[in-house]
Regions:
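Short beta-strand to alpha-helix junction loop
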Residues: 6-9, 36-45, 84-107, 113, ...
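Glycine/proline-enriched, intrinsically flexible loops and inter-domain linkers
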Residues: 324, 328-497
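Helical element adjacent to the flavin cofactor pocket in flavoenzyme catalytic cores
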Residues: 84-143, 151
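Dinucleotide-binding Rossmann-like beta1-alpha1 core, especially the glycine-rich loop
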Residues: 1-71, 194-199, 204-205, 342-354, ...
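Flavin-dependent oxidoreductases
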Residues: 120-234, 241-250, 335-347, 353-357, ...
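C-terminal catalytic lobe of FAD-dependent flavoproteins
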Residues: 194, 203, 225-365
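Short Gly/Ser/Thr- and Asp/Glu-enriched loop/turn motifs at secondary-structure junctions
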Residues: 29-33, 168-170, 261, 490
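Conserved positions in beta-strands of structured domains
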Residues: 119-122, 259, 277, 486
Length: 497
């Protein structure tokens, strides 16, 4: 994600600045990183990522297996097709950077109250925030930022809002150093997605974590307020595939004495992206949560864009994929959210392709025409919980798009000819489109036309009954929405998007 890259890049610069100003206690270890490609397709994907990252100004490059071995001599080079090297990457101590942020905030006049639980959020008749109630008293304010981590859904519920995320069990193991094979402090972070693990140095030994194949949610209905400074029971059976992958790539680990397997919950959103921005319908209430295992890496950038959102009314980056408004009422279904979060976690290290479809938590929402479409041989994809037709295979049974799409990679998918025939039929004859899953809005009143003419990039002033395909633009000329406007009559318009 270009947006996530930019947020992380800003964070790195900020942490470098802190160290340059003498904050050596933040635990920022700028040791670089290696992301290994243990398959040809993984190497192709990494090369694509490198091209995009360089376009954003990141210092990153693709290196050979031999060069990777020179940087991290403890890895087994068998099967490595290449790697990505990021010299400015690293790892840091969460406690150290949190304390540094708190220290600098206090120096700017911020009051920090610990062990203080929010019990309610007051709102006026228009729904805007007026105050926060706590077990230590009431705070008058018109701006609230919900940065409550895995407790964020419970806090948002106080204003009737949805912030969908579910804590996932996330484990890592630490080992003692191996005499004669102590890892130096400058050991780079190593990630091997094909083997499911990541690794870094910890007091001369190994710290190994990863993404289990059968992820488990925890406290999906809400995390208890008093769950603090606690861990979950270790689960070696769950962690086994990660450990096996690490041992394949780094056999030396087998000689290390295990200190402990750490199991700590971390909140994951249904699509793996942050939840940021103002909550629709609750003026003054903002969310900065759902970090989905990228919290520390993006923290500095998230703080910057949240400040911009509050002060300027918009962030300096295009954050549509992270905007909290992307989640509608259907994400109030806890089971649906939990299954989507599990899918994101399960596929976190899998290779992704343009034609990929989500496979879990399907049939959440169906059109009234679903059965008729299925009878016509529809192949269904998923969009925002809706089962939507990707294309038809006339005369064949209906099906859901599945893992078989991975075999096409970045190449031409075999269904292109089917879609071509559908396009020709729509152009030359008559076609019926199921618009159930699209959003529909009505804009009406004396100022309706003027408003639409201002925000749309096409001419909306057409005769009654006209359809205008257009985009809504922001103040910078960027696209906010792709839509069709139907002029129902005079000053009444229907928007379909």
């Amino acid at each position: 994600s270009p947006a996530l890259m930019r947020l992380m890049n800003y964070s790195i610069g900020l942490y470098d600045q802190f160290k340059a100003e003498g904050a050596n206690n933040i635990g920022w270890h700028k040791v670089g990183s290696l992301r290994l490609a243990s398959s040809p397709n993984r190497l192709k994907a990494l090369q694509r990522h490198v091209s995009r990252a360089r376009g954003l100004g990141l210092d990153v490059g693709t290196i050979s297996a031999k060069e990777a071995l020179d940087i991290a001599p403890f890895i087994n080079p068998d099967g490595i097709e290449g790697a990505v090297h990021i010299p400015d990457d690293g790892w840091m101590d969460p406690n150290g950077i949190a304390l540094e942020f708190a220290k600098r905030a206090r120096e700017l006049g911020v009051a920090i109250e610990t062990n203080c639980r929010v019990t309610g959020i007051g709102r006026d008749d228009a729904g805007a925030v007026t105050h926060v109630e706590t077990d230590k008293g009431t705070v008058q304010t018109t701006t609230v930022i919900n940065a409550a981590g895995q407790w964020a859904p419970r806090l948002s519920a106080m204003v009737g809002a949805i912030t969908p995320m579910v804590p996932m069990m996330h484990q890592y193991v630490t080992t003692r150093h191996i005499p004669g094979h102590e890892l130096p402090e400058q050991t780079p972070v190593v990630r091997d997605p094909d083997n499911l693990f990541y690794l870094r140095e910890e007091v001369g030994g190994f710290l190994v974590g990863g993404f289990e194949l059968e992820p488990k949610t925890w406290a999906a209905d809400g995390v208890a307020w008093d769950f603090t400074q606690q861990l979950l029971p270790e689960d070696w059976e769950l962690f086994e595939p990660v450990m096996e992958g690490a041992l394949r790539r780094i056999p030396l680990i087998e000689q290390a004495e295990v200190i402990k397997l750490i199991n700590g919950p971390d909140a994951m959103t249904p699509d793996g992206h942050y939840c940021l921005g103002p909550v629709p319908g609750v003026p003054g209430f903002f969310v900065a949560a759902g970090m989905s295992l990228n919290g520390i890496a993006g923290a500095g950038g998230v703080g910057k864009v949240m400040a911009e959102w509050i002060i300027d009314g918009e962030p300096s980056l295009d954050l549509h994929e992270m905007n909290i408004r992307r989640f509608g009422a259907n994400y109030s279904n806890t089971d649906f959210v939990a299954e989507k979060a599990r899918e994101v976690y399960h596929y976190y290290y899998h290779q992704h392709y343009p034609a990929d479809e989500t496979l879990w938590a399907r049939n959440h929402r169906r059109s009234p025409l679903y059965d008729q479409l299925a009878e016509l041989g529809a192949e269904f994809g998923e969009k925002n919980g809706w089962e939507r037709v990707n294309f038809f295979r006339p005369g064949e049974p209906s099906r859901q798009a599945a893992d078989d799409q991975h075999q096409w990679g970045w190449g031409r998918a075999p269904y292109h000819d089917l879609i071509r025939e559908e396009c020709l039929a729509a152009r030359e004859h008559v076609a019926l489109f199921d618009m159930t899953s699209f959003g529909k809005f009505e804009v009406s009143g004396p100022g309706a036309l003027g408003l639409l003419q201002r925000v749309a990039c096409n001419n909306i002033d057409r005769p009654d009954g006209s359809l205008v395909y257009t985009q809504f633009l922001n103040a910078h000329g960027g696209i906010e929405s792709d839509l069709t406007v139907c002029r129902l009559a005079g000053d009444r318009f229907r928007i379909i998007t």
